[in-house]
């Protein structure tokens, strides 16, 4: 498909001029971050304030963010965090109160109505709700933006047929929305978003109204479109499973601020902000209630009682990039604290080619009797050579 915004001057070639009602851009401090060359979208110290019944309310605060061209960028946060506002700034549905939003280097806030129309024709948008016209067929729904743009009928038909093949709905060409499943309706919405050959696709909670199985099929379709067409995708969601399944990079938004950003594997494997850890809670391998109820803390220098099982929390963050050697890990523990070492809880996952996760390991002390603090410390030191983090939870 045609590349979006062929050069930084594409908007100007679409007859854009500075918006007459817009104030002149404020002079930025010399230390303010500049747009990253080659970035599809850049947010530079962006703030957005809405007038509420109780006075001004800040939806975004000094957001600085760069979205690389050709990737799938996820934005996640709780309800009301500012995610959708961030998205609406990209296609000019909202204007920033401060800062600048740049698409391929062009400041969206300086565009007049003609410039915004040119911009929006090159940015696809997929919504949470399908917004299909019930009285029109699948093909007619997809082709409507082309008809409005004055594209000839024969060309529209060719384009619609190609998009139907792309989203797997060729057999539903003449069907009406009432006969479609939720996933099929969203596929129509995705096809419609691609009619103007965009290279930037915005997805606002595109799977939140779908069941888990259908969600996975839509995410697989988005990933396929990203690979085949080279689209940059900016995806808004409140589900960490969606981020894990399809995104390359993620930004966590909390109360209008971007509190954490990075490759998905790093943010999932080593979350650094409380908001990120809270969002990941649904995917965390928390200690089961039966183990938590029996868990006892270590008592300083006192050895463990005979028959106790030492519980260790073993974490793989993906930072090493290699495959975990679980055999070496258990052997190191067995040499130091117990002959019987086994896994009691947890799991490992692979994200962007990196293995990460949490394992709770029990080392039985029955065969050796009491284990001294020195022996436990030696076991931890040995185990840490085979994992990113190893900590003692206590004993049962």
UniProtKB/Swiss-Prot annotation:
The keyword NADP is assigned to this record: no
SUPFAM superfamilies: ACT-like, P-loop containing nucleoside triphosphate hydrolases
GO cellular component, one term: plasma membrane
Known EC number: 7.4.2.11
Catalytic activity from the UniProt record: L-methionine(out) + ATP + H2O = L-methionine(in) + ADP + phosphate + H(+); D-methionine(out) + ATP + H2O = D-methionine(in) + ADP + phosphate + H(+)
Domain called ABC transporter: residue spans: 41-280
Location in or out of the cell: Cell inner membrane
Membrane topology of the entry: Peripheral membrane protein
InterPro entries, sorted: AAA+_ATPase (IPR003593), ABC_transporter-like_ATP-bd (IPR003439), ABC_transporter-like_CS (IPR017871), ACT-like_dom_sf (IPR045865), MetN_ABC (IPR041701), MetN_ABC_transporter-like (IPR050086), NIL_domain (IPR018449), P-loop_NTPase (IPR027417)
Keywords: Amino-acid transport, ATP-binding, Cell inner membrane, Cell membrane, Membrane, Nucleotide-binding, Translocase, Transport
Binding site for ATP: 77-84
GO molecular function list: ABC-type D-methionine transporter activity; ATP binding; ATP hydrolysis activity
Main location: membrane
Domain of life: Bacteria
Coiled-coil blocks: none
Protein family (similarity comment): Belongs to the ABC transporter superfamily. Methionine importer (TC 3.A.1.24) family.
Subunit structure: The complex is composed of two ATP-binding proteins (MetN), two transmembrane proteins (MetI) and a solute-binding protein (MetQ).
PANTHER family: AMINO ACID IMPORT ATP-BINDING PROTEIN, METHIONINE IMPORT ATP-BINDING PROTEIN METN
Function, as annotated: Part of the ABC transporter complex MetNIQ involved in methionine import. Responsible for energy coupling to the transport system.
Record protein name field: Methionine import ATP-binding protein MetN 2
UniProt organism field: Burkholderia pseudomallei (strain 1710b)
């Amino acid at each position: 498909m045609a590349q979006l915004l062929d050069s930084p001057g594409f908007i100007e070639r679409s007859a854009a001029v500075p918006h007459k009602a817009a104030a002149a851009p404020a002079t930025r401090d010399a230390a303010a971050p500049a747009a990253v060359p080659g970035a599809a979208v850049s947010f530079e110290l962006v703030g957005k304030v809405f007038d509420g019944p109780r006075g001004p309310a800040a939806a975004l605060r000094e957001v600085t963010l760069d979205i690389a061209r050709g990737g799938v960028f996820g934005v996640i946060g709780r309800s009301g965090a500012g995610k959708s506002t961030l998205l609406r700034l990209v296609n000019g549905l909202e204007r920033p109160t401060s800062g600048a939003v740049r698409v391929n280097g062009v400041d969206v806030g300086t565009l007049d109505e003609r410039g915004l129309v040119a911009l929006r024709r090159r940015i696809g948008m997929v919504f949470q709700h399908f917004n299909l016209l019930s009285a029109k067929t699948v093909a007619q729904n997809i082709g409507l933006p082309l008809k409005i743009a004055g594209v000839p009928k024969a060309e529209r038909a060719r384009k619609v047929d190609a998009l139907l093949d792309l989203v797997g709905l060729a057999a539903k060409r003449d069907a009406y929305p009432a006969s479609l499943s939720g996933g099929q309706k969203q596929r129509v919405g995705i096809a419609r978003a691609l009619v103007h050959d965009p290279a930037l696709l915005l997805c606002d909670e595109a799977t939140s109204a779908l069941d888990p199985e259908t969600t996975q099929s839509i995410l697989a379709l988005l990933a396929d479109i990203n690979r085949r067409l080279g689209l940059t995708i900016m995806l808004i969601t409140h589900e960490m499973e969606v981020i894990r399944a399809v995104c390359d990079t993620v930004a966590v938004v909390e109360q209008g601020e971007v509190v954490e950003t990075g490759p998905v594997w790093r943010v999932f494997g080593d979350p650094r902000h409380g908001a990120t850890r809270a969002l990941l809670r649904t995917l965390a391998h928390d200690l089961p209630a039966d183990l938590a109820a029996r868990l006892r803390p270590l008592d300083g220098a006192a050895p463990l009682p005979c028959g106790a099982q030492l519980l260790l929390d073993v974490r793989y963050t993906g930072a090493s990039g290699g495959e975990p050697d679980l055999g070496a890990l258990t052997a190191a523990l067995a040499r130091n604290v117990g002959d019987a070492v086994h896994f009691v809880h947890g799991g490992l996952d692979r994200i962007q080619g990196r293995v990460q996760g949490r394992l709770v390991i029990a080392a039985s002390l029955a065969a050796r009797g009491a284990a001294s603090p020195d022996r436990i410390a030696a076991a931890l030191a040995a185990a840490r050579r085979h994992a990113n983090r190893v900590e003692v939870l206590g004993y049962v």
